[in-house]
Amino acid sequence: MRVQSFLLAATTASTLLACDKQADGPSPMAPNLAARPSGFVTSQPAQARVLLPQASLKPILTVGDPLPGQEANPDPEQRVWAPIPDGLGAYQDGNRLILFANHEITSSGVDGKFPFARVSRLQLDPATLSVTGGSYPITGKATGFLFQRLCSATFAGAAEGLGDGWFLTGEESVTGGAEGIQLAVKHDGSETRKLPALGRFAHENYIAVPGVPGKVVLVGTDDNSPAALGSSFRSELYLYVAEDAAAVLAGTGKLYVFKAGLTNSGQLTTGEPISGSFVEVTGAGALSATDLQTTVDGLGAFKFVRLEDADYDRHPGHSAGPSIYLVDTGNINARCGTDACDLFGSIYRIDLDPADPTQNAHLVLLARSRGVAAGDWASPDNIAVSGRSLMLQEDPAYAGFNRPERIWNFKLGPHGSLGDPQAVAELETEKFTGNVCLEPAGTCWESSGIIDASEWLGSGAWLFDVQAHTLPFRYQDGQNQVSLSREGGQLLYLRLPGS
């Protein structure tokens, strides 16, 4: 998932409020979908559909499509858009929109092709939503830079204290040769840094959060599963604090983990905040994923079931300091009564103290799913937050999930509360494959990577991608066409007025 970075950290509340009240009509950057594209636009049909009459969407790029500017690249896998698109991050460069995308690939690839995770960097014409260029800052081929399952992501720049900007991404895997390392890709794609000081764990996302004077603050979510590091449900919330961008990149900041009077998320009551703090994890950069888990267990870290994505609040007045929304995908096998308990997924909010983000934190359970059988959203994975609302994407993750995978919208209310959920879009799994989404049958897709794109594409604009896990795709290798049996996908534009 990913976050962008163009609201200045020192912007006044009145300016932010003005942004929040922007009109729903066209803006200077709003795309004209009827205009002749200046670059490449996929010819493939949309892999999702809207559920509301006022919403609209458009496919931009499909897995296997050619990347403009890479026609002469000797590597056929770098001439096309790679499978399993995931976390996104974007920034504006003149009249271009630069969009980074993770590709959540393992070392084995897809049918033996595309081994290891990649990061693509696309150049988009925001006026026509067409692709004018593309490349791979992380290719999946460079010795020393072979990674697995790059998941959610964030682009952080000057607003968050990271200068010209870095695309933050990390390995979700901590087994099978993966170490669970956090990465930063420079805005122009010229450099990739490993950031071991941010901790080795199953990285879902690390977001940079403005609002703490004189510090760069990052919040990380641990997407740990019982199969990875033991049998219990123990997923943690991390905080990294550094003096400036150089300190983040050099690893001279400090890593902390959240701790509270309660021990796990199953003990929370909806709407009732608890107090906690972040305790330092000494020597974090030298710890393996297993050693880090042992260390934070010893520190009494608060346990979630399986944290997923996070994003920070952009609405003024919700709290006195930085606030972060985060989701837990839950697990139907969670041991309620003895361990962290969250069967179908939850949405949380944590408020930080701007004077000292490690102290006086307040965590609140905003909503907990009752599962799809009750008509709820479920298995939340990726989120994005605008000044008006929160978007949530589902990744079907439990037996009994038996309907199309959806994107949901929650209006933000007073003090950061959530309005009633509204289903905005759903994936076209059955239309493309003939199979309904059903777990654990393995027929489900997922949408991912959603970001608020209103800054560049007009009010109510979002970008997201689809991981079409059971959909075959093709790509061109010279005179030959290569067919792969699974892991199609797509990048799409979504507009929901008022969001």
What are the functions of these language-model segments?
Residues 8-12:
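Hydrophobic alpha-helical targeting segments used for export or membrane insertion
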Residues 16-18:
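C-terminal motif of bacterial Sec signal peptides marking the signal peptidase cleavage site
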Residues 21-499:
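Sequence/structural signature of beta-propeller domains
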Residues 1-7:
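Bacterial N-terminal signal peptides that target proteins for export
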